[in-house]
Amino acid sequence: MSIKSGEAHTLDERFDRIVSIGMFEHVGVKNDREYFTIARRCLNDNGLFVPHTISGNITGNHTNAWIDRYIFPNSVIPSAAQVSQAVEGQFVIEDWHNFGADYARTLMAWRANFDAAWPRLSSRYDERFRRMWHFYLDSTCANFETRGLHVWQLVLSPGGVRGGYVAPR
């Protein structure tokens, strides 16, 4: 196993497996298709690409103004239509797993860890930051609980897995 970190468009290697965690929502709508094109170029013919992304129910090219300003500048939460359009003609969708309902618990665990660490952090961060971080975690948790946001993990193959892909769940 090798782990590569850096600018994907400069890679000139091929891999059996590529995993991309939390990247797609940050490439920008105009780069959606290129993101998958680069993955395809770097993947062996019998390889698998596993993109993991936060996602939403509505197609758009913007995000919440507060999130854009304070948390994830220039991010866009992709819809199923946007993902499908970017993948079309490049990959076979072998599996599309939505585990967003579980993510609310993750956010609340982060909040609990943050609160437990606050006595050590408070010398570096002010009360305004603490309130903003709580707002981010709590509001995002609510979006996952009400199913407005999701976490998707896809398994994509260049030409289809012979005999079909079996998801290990």
Which stretches of residues belong to each language-model region?
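Conserved SAM-binding strand-loop segment of SAM-dependent methyltransferases
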Residues: 1-8
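Conserved Rossmann-like nucleotide-binding pocket used by diverse enzymes
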Residues: 4, 19, 50
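A short glycine-rich, Lys/Arg-flanked "PGG" loop and its adjoining helix->strand segment in the class I
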Residues: 33-48
